[in-house]
Amino acid sequence: MKMKETLQLGKTAFPMRGNLPNREAEWQKDWEEKGLYEQRQKLNEGKPTFVLHDGPPYANGNIHLGHSLNKISKDIIIRSKSMSGFRSPYVPGWDTHGLPIEQVLTNKGVKRKEMTVAEYREKCKEYALSQVDKQRNDFKRLGVSGDWEHPYITLDPEYEAAEIRVFGKMAEKGYIYKGLKPIYWSPSSESSLAEAEIEYKDVKSPSIYVAFNVADGKGLLDNETAFVIWTTTPWTLPANLGISVNPDFTYVEVKADGRKFVIAKDLLTTVKEAIGWEEVEVLREFSGEKLDRMTAQHPFYDRTSLVMLGDHVTLDAGTGLVHTAPGHGEDDYIVSRKYDLPVISPVDSRGVFTDEAPGFEGIFYDKANPMITELLEEKGALLKLDFFTHSYPHDWRTKKPVIYRATPQWFASISKFRQDILDEVEKVDWLIPWGKTRLYNMIRDRGDWVISRQRAWGVPLPIFYAENGEAIITPETIEHVANLFAEHGSNIWFMREAKELLPAGFTHPGSPNGEFTKETDIMDVWFDSGSSHEGVLREREELTFPADMYLEGSDQYRGWFNSSITTSVAINGVAPYKSIISQGMVLDGEGRKMSKSLGNTILPEKVINQMGADILRLWVSSVDAEADVRVSMDILNQVSEVYRKIRNTMRFLLANTSDFNPAEHTVAYADLRSVDKYMTVRLNQVIQEIRENGYEKYNFMHIYRTVMNFLTVDLSSFYLDFAKDVVYIEAENDYQRRCMQTVFYQTLVSLTKLLTPIIPHTAEEIWSFLQEEEEYVQLAEFPGYETFTNEEELMDTWAAFMDFRDNVLKALEEARHSKLIGKSLEAKVTVYPNEQIRQLMTAVDADIAQLLIVSDFEVSKEVAPSEAVQFEDMAILVEKAEGETCDRCRSVRQDVGSDEKLPTLCGRCAHIVEENYPEAVAEGFE
């Protein structure tokens, strides 16, 4: 027998390398076959419910790291709630309508004009469902647990029916109307856009100052005077019908370059410098109110423009006189309504001028800018042309500029219930405080919601028209259409005539001949997803309304958070969510937005195939996702090192509890040694910290840091560091060894449970090596925590010891640096303490040499020699330990060789070996 065989060296089949890319897929297959999600739901039946409602990602393209951050975060929360005693179902969803899918089909060569609308929509549906399947597999591969076989999809007939009913209830309350208003219009999409579909980019635009000669100055101004306006959109001048001034501003008539002009007094200096006037003479001044209802000659059309009073006119820029085109601006439209001006919008759906703009017919609006500028110069109306860069709205899908264009659209009248929404915003639990202000301000400042879209792929607006043009939206027609959609899907709208879509025998006074037509516009996709509280939360029996939480990216303040609370308050009077968490964007390692053009994108698939989903999940737990987060392969490699630390620590604990049966060998807390009690209390503190300030506050980064601090500081650097001298050296059933194994096992079980929501694959692998009742850790509950007798006194003692130990380690490091010792086991440490430290040595009640990993330790009452390292409350002398190195424990002992049968062992090891291996001692070791 070899002497090495007398050591209790840990053994485990738990592999050192995770091999996550392969093993995770095996675990996931096993979980699916065993129905673990369903088992967990059944286990928690009758318990309090926590519902995190999934915001539906768009069913198009590969998932990206933003998706991963979002889905993993949700999964961590839902798993932690399930393990905390909540019934926490997860129903994933997909948003499946909208322009991007139409664009994909166009790029694939689908000829929309060669098929019926219904046939085209069927193609859209096929593509959308194929993307759902692809993304579903990708999300499952992240380790996200949920009801993947029964997701909600916005193209599902039952969902579409629920959306129709939401629309109907809003219409019944008088919140739906049709109006001709300037709205965001995307020429590239040929459709209206909601505010949520707008993003801003810097563009270079012309900046022009234009003179409008006075036509009727009401006796105050003559025809030799001109009003000066400033605009960055020359193409809107063909639609000009007025000039707006502020009634409270002071305006001046000035003489410059031999002409007379009217400008706001406070902007005169700015305008003078911008146009380049050398000398300006102020002729007189007057209030804006005096200009009301004067007229000016349009600079190139034979018509006049009306001067109007408007509070929207500011002194921030321009001249204090605002070019007003009712068909191309919201403020323009509002002020023109007060003066009963018509609305002219002389561009079509493609952004091309119509015959309402003589001289520019067939010209794309942006191409008309230089033409109009030249015409103004020709007419003597152009005072200055310049260019400047500014932020301008763009279509968030096509990334191309949008315009304001007046078209007949269907609107939801936010103004009618705006205050109700704002009141509900106040009641929501905002886990990120600034989120409340952000959504509140958006809703406070937003206009009415344009909900109609001139596209094919979406839920049709369930509106009929009578022969006299009257719109028909009644509870009867809405319910009938909803039932048709539930049975056949919304494509039925495009397959049947209006009369076939109405209830049998339906009549209307506006249709004496019984003829009807139907709306061809579809609903804004934000109305689709914004109706999920009705189509999902109220429809699925395992869910609740309102949901406990919505968790999405911060872009959803203008999107899903906004549309959901709008529709819910409109029909239910309450917010659809009790709490909101938002997350930032995922940026590259240098803080730049990820994009194909920069070549800095990282696909989740690549990370999973190279490192494993648990690495990605651990990364999610390591970042403060409330703000923008950074990721790169370097960052992920660092996370991988942390994972390796976790894995190796757990492997050490598994190996050194391989002969430990918790039912037989567990030592009661009261019977543990002081140091083991200390570690038990520390473990309990960690459990409490992770549960209360980590999971319950959705602070994953705090969990990550708490776990790593415990593994690194408490375990690796202290407890496990000296543990080998006990668990390897002592006999199998030694009391000290069983004490430590008790702590090891409790740590294993507790940390495995606590890490399950974050790294479920690895946690399940560890769990398979433990002797616990539950077959899967996912079916277990989180560990509890308690307060122990004399806990505070115990922790104070060990906190003081840790400070003492730090001083010893510093002294040992000095000795190592001076070549006095190599390893710490070569040292003898003598302490010259004050009374407080002397009492501490007694209170610790442990083999202090063992705790410090030195061969000899002594507390001296003598005066410290000069070579001792001085500290505030002690001096420490490090010397070379006297004696020989024991072949078994590697300590330097003076009693090595004291046992003639085992001459290379110290007295302690000789005793252990003789007691437990008498035959080997008799026969002699190899």
Swiss-Prot record:
Entry note: cofactor: Binds 1 zinc ion per subunit.
Keyword terms of this UniProt record: Aminoacyl-tRNA synthetase, ATP-binding, Cytoplasm, Ligase, Metal-binding, Nucleotide-binding, Protein biosynthesis, Zinc
GO molecular function: aminoacyl-tRNA deacylase activity; ATP binding; isoleucine-tRNA ligase activity; tRNA binding; zinc ion binding
Record region (Disordered): 1-21
Motif ('HIGH' region): 57-67
EC number(s) stated in the UniProt entry for this protein: 6.1.1.5
Key word Metal-binding present: yes
Binding site for ATP: K596
Cofactor field: Zn(2+)
One GO term of the biological process aspect: isoleucyl-tRNA aminoacylation
Predominant location category: cytoplasm
Superkingdom: Bacteria
Comment on protein domains: IleRS has two distinct active sites: one for aminoacylation and one for editing. The misactivated valine is translocated from the active site to the editing site, which sterically excludes the correctly activated isoleucine. The single editing site contains two valyl binding pockets, one specific for each substrate (Val-AMP or Val-tRNA(Ile)).
Cited function: Catalyzes the attachment of isoleucine to tRNA(Ile). As IleRS can inadvertently accommodate and process structurally similar amino acids such as valine, to avoid such errors it has two additional distinct tRNA(Ile)-dependent editing activities. One activity is designated as 'pretransfer' editing and involves the hydrolysis of activated Val-AMP. The other activity is designated 'posttransfer' editing and involves deacylation of mischarged Val-tRNA(Ile).
Summary of subunit composition and partner proteins: Monomer.
Name of the protein in its database record: Isoleucine--tRNA ligase
Protein source organism: Enterococcus faecalis (strain ATCC 700802 / V583)
